């Protein structure tokens, strides 16, 4: 009996810099498999926008595999059952796959597949594809290993792939096959390796020149940010390739640097900032890799019980619908529903607002934001959610002012008015707090508060003071500081300018 190799595609939907694919093709005929998993697609953190981006990625991957003489086998079901059936039909001796740090469901899935492979006598070979280190003993030296990995050679693409004959390759499924909302039509980027490379090229050749200066404002971030996050989430391109390509661009600028071109200095600063964020990308995923429970539990147990005692559903629904009475909050929520992306500072502000102003526990907003973010990456998501909610004990407590963010990031209301047309006639100086307009002004500008646009659901100053006092009362406790030391040892950055937690 002839045995094949099996490449199990998960969130690594590309052919370049793909160690499992490259190694498998060197060992004989190769089966390339992707599984639509009902338990993942039906989970609370999955949305049609993810499905659409996934399908676009699969279409592109299948096309590229066909060009190499192979094809992508597509199946639906529970992974172990799919693998068992496929193995009976077309025996394979080795499963080749990338390590994945996903949500709890995918974590348990991986354990089941590994167990089945051992029981069946099938070799299971996993490869890392980023800077996340499995079975990490200490954070000391983590950055050094990350740098080593990012500077390794790009894995070449096989010139051809030999696959067994007489296989039912299956079809790409639609949202309706899973009872997903088929009317959800995100205006975000298109998925796939081809689009990933195009997006990176436009960022490094033009869009990224003011990245460092323009990443914080939603007015400029949509163009000036790299927009590579979704492509990294679905593995349409490796983080190593992104990092090395950005370094090559920086080297090119240094080589051709001209004193008469002030843009060169800005470019180098922007590329340096971008590269540091690629490292942070893996830094945060490492937290979930080391402690999968943070998807459901506070990183710092000293904060258990902080917000669990109540959950104001009216506040939550207003935030969800973009009807809080704070324009920058509402515009961001509507932008997310429209396109599935918003820049980091605005994400942090949204979580800060729910956690402090509305005093909501982070779990339910985290699930909703996961559904809204096309680039939802569980490791980054839950680490950042807890950081912005103030329950890590090792990060600075930041309570973003939704008023100050307007004056700092969108003083002319360019972003706000594009998503809140009811405020189109409101003058710039009233945009941060339209409820402070007089009745006459409200009539003049066609924006009656309580009719055309809601009253603020909470008082900013009062909510700020209350949240600050409550969070700091816990943070300064001796027991909290002791717990925070443990959190820092397990998860804290070892950057030289980072202060350790002190008693």
Where are these regions (language model features)?
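Active-site-proximal binding-pocket segments
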Residues: 227-429
């Amino acid at each position: 009996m002839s045995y094949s190799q099996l490449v199990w595609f998960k969130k690594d939907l590309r052919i370049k810099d793909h160690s499992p694919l490259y190694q498998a093709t060197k060992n004989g005929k190769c089966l390339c498999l992707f599984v639509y998993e009902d338990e993942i697609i039906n989970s609370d953190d999955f949305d049609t926008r993810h499905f659409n981006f996934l399908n676009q990625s699969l279409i592109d991957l299948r096309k590229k595999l066909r060009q190499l003489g192979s094809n992508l086998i597509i199946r639906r079901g529970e992974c172990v059952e799919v693998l068992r059936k496929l193995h009976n039909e077309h025996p394979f001796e080795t499963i080749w796959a990338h390590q994945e740090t996903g949500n709890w469901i995918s974590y348990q899935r991986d354990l089941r597949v590994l167990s089945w492979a051992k029981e069946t006598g099938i070799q299971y070979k996993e490869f890392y594809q980023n800077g996340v280190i499995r079975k990490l003993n200490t954070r000391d030296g983590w950055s050094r290993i990350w740098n080593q990995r990012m500077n390794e050679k790009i894995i070449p693409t096989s010139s051809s792939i030999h696959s067994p004959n007489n296989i039912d390759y299956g079809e790409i499924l639609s949202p309706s096959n899973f009872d997903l909302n088929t009317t959800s039509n995100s205006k975000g980027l298109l998925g796939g390796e081809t689009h990933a490379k195009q997006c990176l090229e436009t960022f490094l050749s033009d869009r990224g020149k003011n990245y460092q200066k323009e990443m914080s404002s939603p007015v400029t971030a949509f163009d000036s940010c790299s927009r590579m996050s979704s492509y990294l989430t679905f593995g349409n391109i490796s983080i190593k390739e992104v990092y090395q390509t950005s370094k090559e661009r920086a080297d090119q600028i240094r080589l051709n640097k001209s004193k008469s071109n002030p843009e060169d200095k800005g470019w180098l600063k922007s590329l340096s900032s971008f590269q540091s964020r690629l490292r942070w990308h893996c830094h945060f995923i490492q937290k979930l890799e080391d402690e999968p429970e943070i998807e459901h539990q506070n990183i710092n147990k000293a904060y258990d019980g902080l917000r669990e005692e109540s959950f104001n559903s009216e506040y939550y629904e207003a935030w969800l619908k973009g009807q809080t009475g704070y324009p920058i909050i509402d515009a961001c929520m509507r932008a997310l529903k429209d396109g599935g992306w918003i820049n980091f500072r605005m994400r942090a502000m949204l979580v800060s607002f729910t956690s402090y102003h509305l005093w909501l526990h982070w779990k339910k907003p985290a699930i909703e934001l996961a559904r809204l973010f096309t680039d939802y990456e569980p490791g980054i998501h839950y680490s950042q959610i807890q950081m912005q909610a103030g329950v890590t004990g090792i990060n600075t407590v930041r309570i973003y002012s939704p008023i100050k963010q307007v004056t700092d990031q969108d003083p002319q209301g360019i972003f706000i008015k594009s998503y809140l047309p009811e405020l189109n006639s409101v003058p710039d100086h009233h945009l941060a707090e339209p409820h402070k307009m007089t009745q006459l002004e409200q009539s003049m500008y066609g924006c009656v508060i309580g009719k055309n646009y809601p009253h603020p659901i909470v008082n900013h100053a009062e909510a700020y003071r209350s949240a600050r006092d409550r969070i700091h009362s816990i943070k300064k406790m001796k027991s909290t500081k002791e717990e925070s030391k443990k959190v820092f040892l397990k998860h804290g950055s070892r950057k030289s300018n980072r202060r350790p937690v002190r008693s």
